Amino acid sequence: MSLTGCLPPRPPCSMRRRTSGGGASVSPVVAMASTAGVGGIGNPTPRGKKPFAPWREVPPQVTHTLPPEKKEVFDSLEGWAADTILPYLKPVEESWQPQDHLPDPRSPSFGDEVAALRERAAGLPDDHLVCLVGDMVTEEALPTYQTMLNTMDGGVRDETGAGGSAWAVWTRAWAAEENRHGDLMNKYLYLTGRVDMRQVEKTIQYLIGSGMDPRTENDPYMGFIYTTFQERATSISHGNTARHAGRHGDAALARVCGTVAADEKRHEAAYAAIVAKLFEVDPDYTVRAFARMMRRKVAMPARLMYDGADDRLFARFAAVAQRLGVYTAADYAGIIEFLVARWGVPGLAAGLSGEGRRAQDFVCSLGPRFRRMEERAQEAAKRAPPAAAAPFSWIHGRQVQL
């Protein structure tokens, strides 16, 4: 997962309301210490009571910055989305289902199949299990991601919950495809017997209860850039997890992770196509939205991960993923470079304002800049003492090197 998404705790601050330029609203910042087990966002509870989410400071949240005239852009793309984006979806009857990759409970050999699965999984090291659980927990927070898409302005949200626009159909069908990922990985981990499922399930509930602020300001330009980045990041993460599983002798788990990675790759292609179309019809605003998104850095959707005890659970999970090469800072830089090239940002010329040209220069410089930072960090890491270990409740409190 992206290390840039792991933000250090900030000191408490007082309740205040501010207004950003352009009429955008900024939510109040609630004074909350990062103290686990005391209370939650918007739901103060007496000390000792279990909250819906851990106490966390909520930073200023900028909302609804999309200029009203930009809605016309998405209205004009409705037919294009129906013809170009919806075909990225697979018909349900042609789609894989979790049961296709799991022992069949109707089969007389079900017990033997489960025993074989557990025997293969016994060879997975604890640090790989941590990455697998972290990926699964991220997938299981799907309600949050569908909610995020339906907060976007510009006429792309599903206004009724069963809307007929191409944008609404896409969001629901995308979520339905994504839902299989967490289901499959959850059931697989349950059958392995290697993890503390109650702790994992608590983590999922806490994460959904905590929500996420992707800092996209309800702007679909920024929102679709964010989702493109995230789909590529998850495809990389699941693909690397698949390779690790294969190296440790669990070919079935490798197929599970590879299947999920392939779905994420297809979804990435759809979201990237949307942004490419926006660059075609509105290059100036789109490149400025790209720069705004990257200045905020792309926070991973599971960065509010919490298991009821560990305030730094995501940071530790991310450190393990970085050390194993499941998802690294180099991957983050690589995604930026890929998207800059995919959307033809260096070649933009006509139609750019002065601000647009500055945004173009900024995003084109980011990939190389992050790579240099990563190279320096790697050199420093070689000279540093071995990283400390930390316990993970997901694996019954066993220690894993960070």
From Swiss-Prot:
Give the transit peptide, as a residue range.
1-32
Which pathway does this chain act in?
Lipid metabolism; fatty acid metabolism
Q: Name one GO biological process term.
A: fatty acid metabolic process
Specify which residues bind Fe cation 2 according to the UniProt entry for this protein.
Answer: E178, E231, E264, H267
Keywords recorded for this protein, A-Z: Chloroplast, Fatty acid biosynthesis, Fatty acid metabolism, Iron, Lipid biosynthesis, Lipid metabolism, Metal-binding, Oxidoreductase, Plastid, Transit peptide
Main localisation:
plastid
Q: Which cellular component terms (GO) are annotated to the entry? A: chloroplast
What does the UniProt record say this protein does? Answer: Introduces a cis double bond in the acyl chain of an acyl-[acyl-carrier protein].
What protein does this entry describe?
Acyl-[acyl-carrier-protein] desaturase 3, chloroplastic
